[in-house]
A protein has these predicted regions:
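Aromatic-residue-lined binding/catalytic grooves and analogous aromatic/hydrophobic interfacial grooves
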Residues: 1-442, 457-461, 478-481, 495-496, ...
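Non-membrane alpha-helical structural segments and their capping/turn regions in soluble enzymes
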Residues: 283, 330, 334, 451, ...
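Charged/polar positions within long, soluble alpha-helices
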Residues: 298, 345, 486-489, 539, ...
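Inter-repeat boundary and helix-capping residues of tandem alpha-helical solenoids
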Residues: 329, 447-450, 625, 684
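Well-ordered alpha-helical segments within folded domains of soluble proteins
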Residues: 377-387, 447-458, 525-535, 593-602, ...
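Short, small-residue-rich loop/turn micro-motifs
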Residues: 428, 449-451, 455-457, 500-502, ...
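Non-catalytic carbohydrate-binding regions of carbohydrate-active enzymes
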Residues: 459-460, 464, 468-469, 480-490, ...
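Acidic/histidine-rich catalytic neighborhood
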Residues: 479, 483-540
Length: 784
């Protein structure tokens, strides 16, 4: 059904959260499709504040023993207060903190005939093309826009029945200047040398050095029309066919190189991009673009049976009607899945930067939370759908960023802790900042981030079976494990734990003082991440035939692994988030960090440890289903792991609540009219989390049987309300590609293709079956 792969409205975007996103992994464009002032909000993935910097003023190696002693004595309030003073120093240009992602600015396409009748605008996800049409005083007006990965430019073409006049302008909150000449105009900007979250930006360091410089170059091509520069604008008279090409380049090279020393002539690169695009022409670029996107998008699509009444309804209106229904319209469920994959293709391509809190889209100088890499859930959640929904190539930017993290993290580990290996904390940026941020320790101090990001490495191997890849990445795995191994301390019983320890952005109540506290001994998330990393490192070493005898660290990991403190089940039957019977500060907190072992990891499963799995389920029940947008995405996928399809769907229903962009209306978690996830504000991780969750409701492959087979669950959490549908191209660990089809009449067909030899056990609603598949083999499962 077309509505399940299309965003559609009958009015221009009223604000940024109604605009449609286009992207080629590097350039992001938000399309308003206005009639009088048609705004295109532009961004580019290297436009960050800051400069290379390996200074870490917070040094903890001499402070940790004192904090550990206080925690050992149960003096949680005193330990938390002292730690806050250490981490809570207000940052400034001399204080190293994560940098912010910066907008490029807004292209304005101003027409002289704003009147419009019969207005429609549409984002075709399969083609990654925005189209708009209406009738004005000059007759029928239509436009087509896309961001081309093959041609490295943003393209917009506007055609009208009769000639129109236009003015093209540009504005930006970033420091810079606009100039125009011939049929081109340019915005030459410079990112702040320092800026943090929503605070004031500083454009020069104390030494007079500046941030990343960039150019936005716009070329207007209008056959038969007059195009002229007028001050800082282009004026176009008498155009029936206007083609706009936009290139954006910067002088960012890598995390070590000062921008001014990069040797990158970004202005010349812009000109080369525009020249090549103009020479190729609109039709050829559109054809190359749709072929490029289709090769990725068409691998996996979800189509659900839906009433005809949902077809052709504007997306915003469909969302508006959702709260009054018991279940979210199945059209929206399928659209949510397909849109998440679309966003990944648009925001993360080989050779580009990893997606941040807002993907690659931003209209602010200092956006919320800096639109940075938030590593205690959000950055990792961005890539949850990559493997399961068949977009493994889109992981490459995040993998490249892991190398940056590891490089800078080695400096941080030595300077801050005096320890080997590499570390990573809560916030980072394009420069790879790896130290604690300033602020409350329950988010500023979290040294296990390296362990979480490294799970992408082993997951890639489990899906691909690529030994060369694993060998290439093993030193990164080893370095993360080396740091966390050295960070561990013994408790009174000789068990190993982290201390001080936090559980991201959550705290507990000190039983003695009644005060809110931030740090404990051995939070469950810390130990789940460390346990998984040690197991992964040892497993990888075995696959690569790296002997323990030849690597003392591996011997240490093997000795430490069984000594890690085990999860604690509290008297109420829930998992202890903070290591023992410490009461939660907020039982309904948005983070569910103590359930890391359920998802994304596979530490707590019904096969491996049913008691802990049951305690995790009780813990999720206490936390509750309603939360911020991204947090509901995590809850959906947890419910899928607990095989609760109907409850997972109910959370998706709440996730599809329309959030108002302006004053009034719903302000909790949900989606905006353009389907962007609302924390609020917009955070893209909720979109990716929801897409991964929908895939997990239909296919799971994270478990292994006692005899070593990959356990594949089919329809593990299918809601009763999804009467029929089909999904293609899902990926399972072990190298399987799976198509699933089901009908309201009870028919089921599962088609399985194997990339490589493997041993599997399949669990379906109609029975179980083991199978040994050869590379290129095919298996079809259906009820007898």
């Amino acid at each position: 059904m077309k509505s399940q792969e299309t965003l559609f409205e009958i009015a221009p975007a009223a604000d940024w959260n109604e605009a449609y996103p286009l992207g080629n992994g590097r350039i992001g464009a938000m399309i308003f499709d206005g009639t009088a002032d048609d705004v295109v909000a532009l961004s580019e993935d290297t436009l960050w504040a800051g400069r290379p910097d390996s200074e870490y003023p917070v040094v903890l190696k001499d402070t940790l023993p004192m904090l550990r002693r206080l925690l050992r004595e149960g003096r949680y309030t005193e330990a938390s207060d002292r730690f806050w003073k250490i981490c809570g120093e207000k940052p400034g240009p001399g204080f190293r903190d994560s940098a912010v992602f910066v907008t490029a600015g807004n292209l304005h396409i101003i027409a002289d005939d704003p009147a419009a009748r019969g207005y429609t605008r549409m984002l075709d996800l399969r083609r990654a093309v925005d189209t708009c049409s209406y009738t004005g005083t000059c007759g029928k007006v239509s436009s087509t826009a896309f961001c081309s990965y093959p041609d490295a430019v943003f393209v917009k073409r506007i055609r009208s029945a009769r000639a129109r006049n236009y003015r093209l302008g540009f504005d930006s909150p970033v420091k810079g200047s606009v100039s125009a000449t011939g049929n081109e105009f340019f915005f030459d900007g410079v990112c702040p040398a320092w800026a943090r979250k929503t605070e004031t930006a500083t454009y020069e360091t104390a030494d007079g050095l500046t941030g990343i410089a960039f150019r936005v170059a716009v070329r207007a091509i209008a056959p038969g029309a007059a195009v002229a520069a007028a001050d800082d604008q282009l004026v176009i008279d008498g155009a029936r066919d206007l083609l706009l090409l936009v290139a954006i380049r910067s002088n960012f090279k890598d995390c070590d190189t000062n921008p001014e020393d990069s040797g990158i002539d970004f202005r010349a690169l812009c000109r080369a991009d525009l020249d090549a695009a103009e020479a190729r022409g609109f039709d050829a670029m559109l054809k190359a673009h749709t072929k490029d996107v289709g090769a990725l998008y068409d691998r996996s699509r979800l189509i659900l049976d839906a009433p005809v009444s949902e077809e052709g309804v504007p997306t915003g209106r469909l969302i508006e009607g959702s709260p009054g229904k018991r279940f979210a319209p199945t059209t929206l469920i399928a659209l949510l899945y397909n849109f998440g994959r679309y966003l990944m293709i648009a925001s993360s391509r080989p050779g580009t930067r990893a997606t941040n809190l807002q993907g690659i889209w931003n209209n602010m100088l200092t956006p919320p939370w800096g639109s940075n890499y938030t590593l205690n859930i959000n950055a990792e959640m961005n890539y949850w759908p990559a493997q399961t929904t068949n977009l493994a190539e889109c992981l490459e930017p995040f993998e490249s960023q892991i190398r940056v993290f590891a490089k800078q993290g080695a400096v941080a580990a030595e300077k801050i802790y005096g320890l080997p290996g590499w570390c990573l904390h809560h916030n980072s940026d394009i420069w790879g900042f790896a130290g604690p941020a300033s602020g409350c320790p329950w988010w500023a101090y979290w040294p296990v981030g390296g362990g979480w990001v490294c799970r992408k490495i082993m997951e890639h191997y489990r899906f691909s079976g690529d030994n060369a890849y694993l060998k290439q990445w093993f030193p990164i795995l080893r370095g993360a494990a080396e740091f966390l191994s050295a960070l561990l301390v013994e408790d009174d019983e000789g068990k190993l734990m982290t201390s001080p320890s936090t559980s991201p952005e959550h705290g507990f109540i000190d039983p003695e003082t009644g005060e809110d506290c931030t740090c404990c001994e051995g939070s469950l998330m810390d130990l789940s991440i460390i346990r998984e990393l040690f197991e992964t490192c040892l497993e990888a070493a075995g696959i690569l035939r790296v002997g323990i005898a030849g690597d003392p660290l591996l011997a240490t990991l093997a000795e430490q692994l069984p000594r890690l403190r085990k999860p604690v089940i509290k008297a109420d039957g829930c998992l202890s988030e903070f290591g023992n019977e410490l009461p939660d500060k907020d039982p309904h907190h948005r983070h569910v960090s103590h359930l890391y072992g359920v998802y994304p990891a596979a530490e707590f499963t019904s096969l491996r440890n049913p008691d802990l799995f049951r305690a995790a389920w009780r813990s999720l029940n206490v936390r509750g289903d309603l939360s911020t947008g991204w947090a509901m995405g995590w809850r959906v996928i947890l419910r899928a792991r607990f095989l609760e399809g109907d409850r997972a769907e109910r959370i998706l229903h709440h996730l599809l609540t329309l959030v108002s962009s302006g004053p009034g209306g719903h302000r909790g978690g949900g989606v905006y009219r353009n389907m962007f996830d609302a924390h609020p504000p917009f955070q893209i991780d909720g979109n990716f989390g929801a897409t991964a969750a929908i895939a997990e409701m239909l296919l799971q492959s994270h478990e292994t049987t006692d005899d070593g087979r990959t356990l594949v669950r089919l329809f593990p959490a299918l809601p009763k309300n999804w009467k029929g549908g089909r999904i293609t191209g899902l990926r399972a660990r072990g190298g399987l590609t799976i198509d699933i089809r089901w009908g309201s009449d009870g028919t089921r067909t599962v088609t399985i293709k194997a990339d490589r030899d493997g041993r599997f056990h399949f669990i379906t609603p109609w029975g179980e079956r083991s199978a040994d598949l050869k590379a290129g083999g095919r298996l079809v499962l259906r009820p007898a």
